[in-house]
Amino acid sequence: MASAVFRLLQQGPRRLLAPAVPTLAPPVRGVKKGFRAAFRFQKELERWRLLRCPPPPVRRSEKPNWDYHAEVQAFGSRLQETFSLDLLKTAFINSCYIKSEEAKRQSLGIEKEAALLNLKDNQELFEQGLSFSHRCLTQFLEDEFPDLPAEGTESLVSFLTGEAVVCHVARNLAVEQLTLSAEFPVPLPVLRQTFFAVIGALLQSSGPERAALFIRDFLITQMTGKELFEMWTVVNPMGLLVEELKKRNISAPESRLTRQSGSTTALPLYFVGLYCDRKLIAEGPGETVLVAEEEAARVALRKLYGFTENRRPWDYSKPKESPKRAEQTSVAS
């Protein structure tokens, strides 16, 4: 004890009056891992919040790095089609956009005459494109399915030119991002009108042949994997089958129960076959005998119309141009 006091006295009074140096604690190894876990948890919370309450969609033109003129030019190159730039820009302008922009100008105090925009909407191009698409699709379907009646052809054309199919194609071709509309997301009728206006612009720019190939490549392909009666609603398939057989001088079909399983259970299954002149022409399943009979009639109609599941695939190779066909198409357009 005395020796320790002696050493302190030797170091001088400064050592005695010096403040004590705090001892640093060793670093805790789990601090960084805790920060990482908290950061991951915060990111997961943010992801779930976006999934439950997604932000409203924003126009592409409201985001950075957007050049409308360059995007319109790139649209034709992306589809490998030649468009007149003025016609293509007109195809993307809808009347609702012009009205909304004029209303915004008037709300800012601009006079009505000065607020008018020197723009032309796509109504004329839409009518041309829709009319040409109807004629072209009808011709394609009549050539591919010659036994299909006119009612069936019209139903298929209506399906291919309906809002669901056309808007699906238009969105995948980025037509929605270039469409000038008062609302966003673009309403389905406006998007459908814009797509057919683009076809009308292509018809005037490159001619009927390129427009027909465009329709074949982007609308006819939507029939892939579709069953005939998904696109054509037939209320009474048995009555239609009787009419078709009568046109072909074939006797009326007779239905016979060919197989059944689980008739006393909750999930029964029946197979009904249709016979003409003692020959089985079709067979269909169903949970009741009536449903199975209707399905057998649909199977027979598919065979008559050449719309079976094992039919020859659609030929998408470049068609050989027929002078007579080309002349008819050009005259029709």
Curated annotation (Swiss-Prot):
CDD domains associated with the record: DSRM_MRPL44
Keywords: Endonuclease, Hydrolase, Mitochondrion, Nuclease, Ribonucleoprotein, Ribosomal protein, RNA-binding, Transit peptide
Transit peptide extent on chain: 1-30
Family: Belongs to the ribonuclease III family. Mitochondrion-specific ribosomal protein mL44 subfamily.
Subunit structure: Component of the mitochondrial ribosome large subunit (39S) which comprises a 16S rRNA and about 50 distinct proteins.
Protein's UniProt name: Large ribosomal subunit protein mL44
GO cellular component: mitochondrial inner membrane; mitochondrial large ribosomal subunit; nuclear body; plasma membrane
Summary of the function given for this chain in its UniProt record: Component of the 39S subunit of mitochondrial ribosome. May have a function in the assembly/stability of nascent mitochondrial polypeptides exiting the ribosome.
Molecular function as annotated in GO: double-stranded RNA binding; ribonuclease III activity
Annotated Gene3D superfamilies: 3.30.160.20, Ribonuclease III domain (1.10.1520.10)
One BP annotation, GO: RNA processing
Gene: Mrpl44
Biased composition regions of type Basic and acidic residues, renumbered to the chain: 311-327
InterPro entries: dsRBD_dom (IPR014720), Ribosomal_mL44_DSRM_metazoa (IPR044444), RM44_endonuclase (IPR055189), RNase_III_sf (IPR036389)
Protein EC: 3.1.26.-
Organism of this sequence: Mus musculus (Mouse)
DRBM domain boundaries: 236-306
Enzyme class name: hydrolase
Intrachain S-S bonds: none
All residue ranges annotated as the RNase III domain in the record: 86-228
Region feature Disordered, mapped onto this chain: 311-333
Protein origin, superkingdom: Eukaryota
Subcellular location: Mitochondrion
Location, primary (coarse class): mitochondrion
